[in-house]
């Protein structure tokens, strides 16, 4: 079972549908209706932390999930989930130079992990006004994808390789290979 932490975002069920279409059972829980103890009892194969409004400090259980479970359970943070990974690892979250709500960008990547067998670059849809600050990027994270103006679009923890984040929305119809990216995550160790 794949657990999706819902940060009160309208895209959460699009993510759940994509995961279901890839053949996985999905459980969606709101970020204030579950805790780490309950998650451990559920024993999910993987966790996805959804997009949502606000800042990482307003993402309910998301920060606790990352800090408590990243060593044991593969976690993918999407948008706010990605920012939460940056924040909990010591990064600064800042306003993006140009707000990107429903805009597409070319995404360049390292061709590894989530990005295996994806075109480089590919088009992805962005819905955000905050980003992880490259100037204060955590040393225990690696940048794995970026835009042509060097905005961080994905990261991976250097020690807990199962902890990854993506700023863009793989569930959007305008993200060219979002389903394959999710499949790469779901098929990974």
UniProtKB/Swiss-Prot annotation:
Other notes: Component I catalyzes the formation of anthranilate using ammonia rather than glutamine, whereas component II provides glutamine amidotransferase activity.
Subcellular location, principal: plastid
Q: Where along the chain is L-glutamine bound?
A: 52-54, 83, 129-130
| Classification via PANTHER family | MULTIFUNCTIONAL TRYPTOPHAN BIOSYNTHESIS PROTEIN, MULTIFUNCTIONAL TRYPTOPHAN BIOSYNTHESIS PROTEIN-RELATED
Which EC number(s) are documented for this chain? Answer: 4.1.3.27
Pathway field of the UniProt record reads: Amino-acid biosynthesis; L-tryptophan biosynthesis; L-tryptophan from chorismate: step 1/5
Q: Where is the active site?
A: 79 (nucleophile), 169, 171
Compartment(s): Plastid, Chloroplast
Q: Which GO terms describe its biological process?
A: L-tryptophan biosynthetic process
NCBIfam families registered for this protein in UniProt = trpG_papA
Q: GO MF annotations for this entry?
A: anthranilate synthase activity
Q: Can you say what this protein is called?
A: Anthranilate synthase component 2
Enzyme class per UniProt: lyase
